[in-house]
């Protein structure tokens, strides 16, 4: 029997953290651990709880990638990407081409439709779809995104 997708995501995230990487996000350890997809670990294991200031996360994640970690950034709702997309798209995604410095970031952004408001709901990955250096994947692809990360 195959594992549910949330268990696969949790296991892959745990393995990634065991390699000395970090997982960032807001309210990661809050009720449900982001739908059961975040391993129940602590900051010493690489789990980083970001503040609720929606505009600072892109810079923190980009900085983490530039110092050599391979951060996973969990965004609870894709609508919040509007606040963080600028530095990720214009600095992190272009860093390798412009300065020869790789800046790998894996962003897990949850897409939902309806019922949760005009900012949090819907799928907003189109705002970065055409940016050089950014690849978009969906759960239907399975573990392929992690292989290339």
PLM regions: where:
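Thiamine diphosphate
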Residues: 1-149
């Amino acid at each position: 029997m195959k594992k549910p997708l949330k268990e696969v995501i949790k296991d892959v995230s745990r393995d990634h953290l065991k390699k000395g990487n970090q997982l960032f996000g807001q309210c990661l350890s809050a009720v449900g651990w982001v739908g059961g997809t975040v391993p129940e670990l602590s900051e010493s294991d690489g789990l980083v709880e970001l503040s609720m200031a929606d505009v600072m996360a892109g810079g923190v994640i980009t900085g983490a990638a530039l110092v050599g970690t391979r951060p996973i950034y969990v965004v609870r709702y894709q609508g919040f990407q509007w606040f963080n997309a600028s530095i990720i798209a214009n600095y992190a995604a272009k860093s390798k081409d412009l300065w020869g410095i790789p800046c790998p970031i894996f962003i897990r952004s949850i897409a939902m439709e309806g019922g949760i408001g005009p900012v949090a709901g819907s799928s907003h990955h189109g705002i970065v779809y055409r940016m050089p250096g950014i690849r978009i994947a969906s759960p239907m692809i399975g573990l392929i995104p992690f292989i290339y990360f």
